[in-house]
Amino acid sequence: METIAFRMRLHPGKRDEYRRRHDAIWPELADALRAAGISDYWIFLDEDTHHLFAVLKRPIGHRIAQLAETDVMRRWWAYMADLMATGPDGRPVEKSLEPMFHLE
């Protein structure tokens, strides 16, 4: 099992709507994330910079890359596109973060 982190960017003024949509995450999306191997998934907001920091665990042999090919993931990205920075394909712009410290 490995832990990864990445950063995304929320548009200013979209905090409450972002939280509302995630509080009502579609069950089929949650199932797809779990089926891809994602667990212990957290997203934090830095309100000063509008950066979202995501941290999750995934096993060796995870299927996260295949999520982009699923209908539910594409629909979620389209649903969230008005709230955050996205690429030409509609997926959120993500920046991988380097681990600097870990205390177990």
UniProtKB/Swiss-Prot annotation:
One of its GO terms (biological process) is rhamnose catabolic process. The active site is at H22. InterPro entries: Dimeric_a/b-barrel, L-rhamnose_mutarotase, Rham/fucose_mutarotase. Homodimer. This is L-rhamnose mutarotase. Substrate binds at Y18, Y41, W76, W77. It catalyses: alpha-L-rhamnose = beta-L-rhamnose. Pathway: Carbohydrate metabolism; L-rhamnose metabolism. One of its GO terms (molecular function) is L-rhamnose mutarotase activity. It is an enzyme of class 5 (isomerase). Its EC number is 5.1.3.32. The lineage of its organism: Bacteria, Pseudomonadati, Pseudomonadota, Betaproteobacteria, Burkholderiales. The keyword Cytoplasm applies. The gene is rhaM. Keywords: Carbohydrate metabolism, Cytoplasm, Isomerase, Rhamnose metabolism. One of its GO terms (cellular component) is cytoplasm. It is found in: Cytoplasm. It comes from Burkholderia ambifaria (strain ATCC BAA-244 / DSM 16087 / CCUG 44356 / LMG 19182 / AMMD) (Burkholderia cepacia (strain AMMD)). Involved in the anomeric conversion of L-rhamnose. Its main location: cytoplasm. Belongs to the rhamnose mutarotase family. HAMAP family: L_rham_rotase (MF_01663). Signal peptide: none annotated.
